[in-house]
Amino acid sequence: MINTKKLLKMAKKWQQRAALKRKRISFQRSTTTTTTTTTTTSSSTAVEKGCFVVYTVDKIRFAFPLSYLNNSVFEELLKISEEEFGLRAGGPITLPFDSVFLEYLIKFIERRMDGDTEKALLMSISSARCSMQPQEQQSGYTQQLLVF
């Protein structure tokens, strides 16, 4: 039987590990061998080849494959970032959204939305940006989510 102190110590350790895992989004990469396909997930701090990193306003780090640069929704996010923070030569790219909103957008992008949904999402992002600007100085960032 495990004593109480050891059990509490183990629980605290697992909670810390779980908290670290929640902060990272890692993309699955398929590697094909001659007989089977295996999927591995990378959660290290180094960025894999063919990926780029962006940060959110709440300092959460996201790594994306370069193929996301061809997506019109992601292009709009980068334009908004450029308008908000400018182009940084040596610093990281920071998106003017929190991590919850970015995770929401990632789900839409991964689902390969149709043209109408993409247009609605772009309009939602643009309107949220326009409605945020006067309020930013007073109350911080507020965001509206488009629900389908």
From Swiss-Prot:
Major localization listed first in the record, in broad terms: membrane
One Gene Ontology biological process: auxin-activated signaling pathway
Topology in membrane: Peripheral membrane protein
Signal peptide interval: none
Pfam families documented for this protein: Auxin_inducible
Taxonomy, superkingdom: Eukaryota
Alphabetic keyword roster: Auxin signaling pathway, Cell membrane, Developmental protein, Growth regulation, Membrane
Family annotation (InterPro entries): SAUR_fam
A cellular-component GO term for this protein: plasma membrane
Cell compartments where the protein resides: Cell membrane
Biological function: May promote auxin-stimulated organ elongation, such as hypocotyls, stamen filaments and petals.
The family this protein is said to belong to: Belongs to the ARG7 family.
Stated name of the protein: Auxin-responsive protein SAUR65
UniProt gene name: SAUR65
